[in-house]
């Protein structure tokens, strides 16, 4: 349902089970001129945690989502580790890193193939492909052998699905009936569709690898304040099991994911000029010392104004959360340690408030977090594995570094981050195995609560910088705030009316067909929002409102 009252547009959201997001945009002259990102779900986890034992935090926070899973547990545990001042054993850090590495591999594969691919790949067009020609192309792109027969089998599956009339997840796909924004040759569509199906099996292996150290997936239960508990995973046979699964997934990443990414991107190079933002922030990830952000394998840093010649150090003291345009009491910005979560529902745009998300700002400015931020900082800091991967992508596509600041660059960065993390997993695994063989099997350090203290845990999750902030007194949580990647990227305006990252990125995006705005989905999905989404397009020239589901 929607209505227009003067300049005020109200659109009911379309929601899904993993969360609720609505995007409103105004289109003028075939391009987006204004955008609003609206989260319509209130959870109030911070309120639930007050008065509880800090050790309980991870069990609540990671259940905010079954997709993000481990990252919230790790952020909570790191926050309490920091709060009590415990130094965890090296093996515990390695085990945490290995589980996070497996999460990166799983998360980015699922995103590219199963959450984002349909924005670029026309599955129906795969029926028009020549399987023999497609097989030759696949073999030219990758050292992995692809047969004509295997692609014929995929075509048969797609044909049977189409002829059944029961299209399942493809029912509302924008490519059905043809769409001018889909430009891949039929053979590339067929290859991508085949790998879409194969990735369903591969991602299970990554999830199983996570569960070897994490005890289960989703919602790991091996982290504790002071380290880890999964001593069983130190057995040689368990380490060998992880290594086998890891190698299978890494091979798929190197020989399939990256080649598919480059193949698809080559036909959409115009998207290197769409979806641009200006500021980027990352806390880095995969530490050797949990208390030193500079010890992390992928570096921390801040980039201003798309300037790769300079990277500032990240200063956590400069973070504030704004609520002037959110459904919370007050209008003042607060540092997370002083954060207040008191809901105040109005209506959409009532008192100018339009989202349950707060608006994080760093030094008063909106920042993008996520794979693109991480890759840009690492590239600017001459992080060797990242430089090698980025240069390969730029050379293959025939574009310069400026192309990274875009929807296409954001999607490519996710693959680059997946690749560089996967390559380093073997280093951590070898180190853990060597420690165990040398008789070094400690995973936990004992600790005590101070009378009162505060702490923060930073995790560079697959979707971007995540932080949990805790204040405890007498072993009970007095205040708890979490600042998640989606609030950085998909939050509302701040007190200074500065747009969030996705709101900025959508401005100027061309829309070929307002009734099927796949262009909006491409940019929104490039952030991998961990919430269900509804997209609405308002055309001020016709006063017509269109509702869409993100597929």
Curated annotation (Swiss-Prot):
EC nos: 1.12.2.1
Top-rank taxon: Bacteria
Subcellular location(s) per record: Periplasm
Gene Ontology terms, MF aspect: cytochrome-c3 hydrogenase activity; ferredoxin hydrogenase activity; nickel cation binding
Catalytic activity: 2 Fe(III)-[cytochrome c3] + H2 = 2 Fe(II)-[cytochrome c3] + 2 H(+)
InterPro entries according to UniProt: Ni-dep_hyd_lsu, Ni-dep_hyd_lsu_Ni_BS, NiFe-Hase_large, NiFe/NiFeSe_hydrgnase_LSU
Subunit composition and interactions: Heterodimer of a large and a small subunit.
Record protein name field: Periplasmic [NiFe] hydrogenase large subunit
Gene: hydB
